[in-house]
């Protein structure tokens, strides 16, 4: 039985890094938090069953002097949208280890004879030109290798989302009227947002 499954584990000979991660909430997504790596276990994690704007499955180890345009940074980005864990740990000799993978808080997977288990991918990026170069590398990697479909390199359809127009005060007729008006304006896609509450 598997009770811990990490996608990446890196070790550094010193702890002279800051841990950077992104946190947030509704209407204030992707806030940057930068804290020194310390002699303790530090983690960025989600146990909500999904990754989200609360805690993104992404972290950076940045040298103390690293900024947007200079300095060494190591990015860890999990391609995973469930319970995740990215943790740092420093031992008595100042050796730093960082692990990234499935959150083991309630993880247990029984493997039968001959079966295998694949952990989520963790995309690691190194830059000696700061956070900006790391970000641009991730953007290129994801646009070329993760984005799929016919719209990968084309403009996507213009859409109208029903939420701001009617919130939860909707009827079938209101939604049809919105969709008809949107079509007359050339809007190509109508998103029924929160219509699953029922009418």
Language model feature labels by segment:
Residues 1-89, 96, 105-107:
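Polysaccharide-binding surfaces and accessory modules of carbohydrate-active proteins
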Residues 4-6, 121, 193-194:
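Glycine-rich, histidine-containing beta strand-loop boundary motifs that form or position
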Residues 70, 92, 152-154:
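A short, polar/charged loop/turn motif at coil->beta-strand junctions and beta-hairpin connectors
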Residues 73, 116, 157:
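A residue-level signal for beta-strand positions that form part of recognition/binding surfaces
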Residues 109-128:
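Short Pro-Gly-centered flexible turn/kink motifs
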Residues 124-157, 164:
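Terminal connector regions
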Residues 151-199:
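Aromatic-lined carbohydrate-binding/catalytic grooves of carbohydrate-active enzymes
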């Amino acid at each position: 039985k598997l009770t811990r499954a990490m996608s990446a584990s890196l070790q550094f000979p010193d702890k002279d890094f800051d841990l950077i991660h992104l946190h947030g909430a509704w209407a204030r997504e992707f806030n940057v938090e930068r804290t020194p790596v310390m002699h303790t276990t530090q983690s960025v994690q989600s146990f909500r069953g999904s990754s989200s704007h609360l805690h993104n499955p992404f972290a950076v180890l940045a040298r103390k002097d690293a900024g947007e345009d200079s300095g060494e940074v190591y990015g860890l980005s999990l391609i995973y949208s469930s319970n995740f864990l990215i943790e740092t740990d420093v031992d008595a000799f100042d050796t730093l280890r960082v692990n990234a993978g499935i959150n083991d808080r309630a993880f247990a997977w029984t493997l039968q004879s001959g079966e295998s288990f694949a952990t989520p991918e963790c995309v690691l990026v190194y830059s000696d030109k700061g956070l900006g170069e790391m970000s641009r590398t991730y953007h290129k990697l994801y646009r070329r290798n993760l984005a799929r479909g016919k719209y990968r390199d084309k403009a996507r359809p213009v859409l109208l989302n029903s939420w701001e127009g009617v919130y939860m005060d909707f009827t079938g007729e209101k939604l049809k009227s919105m969709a008809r008006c949107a079509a007359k304006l050339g809007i190509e896609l109508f998103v029924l947002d929160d219509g699953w509450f029922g009418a």
